[in-house]
């Protein structure tokens, strides 16, 4: 796993050198029943230099700008997560360009299609002074019966000349997606808690795993 950076999808700080960053979204934060600031500040205090992607919860430009200013005032190594489109399906590239031109690190999220990737490539003010993450929602793409690897490989190839741009495999569904992402050339993959808990299974002896599974089923049957 040294070929890709693993970001944890959540705010439970892990004492684990494999975790290189953290990401959040409004759905994840909802379960904590706290304000965004109260959730983020303790993480920044513990990990001031670790990349932390925080998604805005606004849908119009003025509200997004106001929210971004508030988030950046907290310090830390913040990436502002902006969806590629708003709830009306309109591109957010104007506000994203605005942030990039201010040398604010951005994570473009909720990316699903080649059209969106091409729109990013053709319309963004990309330079070497700011850092940009492009988050492809691979798991949700796979849910539709389409391989996300095609889009990920295309995106990696398209942006390969930009050392400040990283492609992220998001919406991870299973441990093997880590190796899918590596094979695509992705720089980062996010993993939720249920995948993090399974990392210890990597490299496990399959014959032993088979035996343990049979034992588990027998125990379950005996308890009926």
Annotate the PLM regions.
Residues 2-105, 138-141:
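Active-site beta->alpha loop and helix N-cap motifs at the rims of alpha/beta catalytic domains
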Residues 90, 97, 104-197, 203-221:
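Catalytic alpha/beta core domains of metabolic enzymes, predominantly
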Residues 224:
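Aromatic-anchored helix/helix-loop segment that forms the rim or "lid"
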